[in-house]
Amino acid sequence: MMHTRKLAVAGGFEFTPDIHSDHRGLFVSPLQDEAFVAAVGHRFPVAQTNHSRSARGVLRGLHFTATPPGQAKYVYCARGRALDAVVDIRVGSPTFGQWDLVQMDAESFRAVYIPDGLAHAFLALEDDTVMSYLVSSAYRAELEHAIDPLDPAIGLPWPQEVEFRLSARDTIAPRLAEAEAKGMLPQYADCLPAAAPPAHPDRPTVR
């Protein structure tokens, strides 16, 4: 069983799986194909899996991939705790500039689907926080970009009691308005999934 919530960002979803526990431990399925297709409308095309481990206070993001080709992500916390952020940076999107936050931990195994063109970040709230990613395309450095995760115009409410640790790249990343002015941001139309062909293109579809 999977519980689904639409994010405040168009096209994004939160998935919370049922957990099966007994005296041995637990078993959980963070990605379930049937539930994913029912929510999103297509299967998740896994091309690569990624794994990160972070100390408390590590803030990774806001990251996005040039679109096209884009990169969709399915992210969950396998160990520790994290605050996950998704920001709509698609120019022309009905939810441009909006964001949503998801509390992630290794107790709920809550996951987030991040479609092409959205920016993603997370803040590790415990040492040895492990995040697992399924992504729709292989990593290509020349396509990867970042936006300042502390941009006041976006206004992500990161907890202030945590001392942030950012990479050199994320520290100097442009703010959203600067990235838009430079033409760095994806266009909403380029991020929409292509329409699926009919099952029998040689004859009309019967409804």
Regions found by a protein language model. Give the residues of each.
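Ligand-binding loop in jelly-roll beta-barrel domains
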Residues: F109, D116-V135
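Non-catalytic, conserved peripheral segments adjacent to functional cores
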Residues: M1-E107, E126-D128, A138-R207
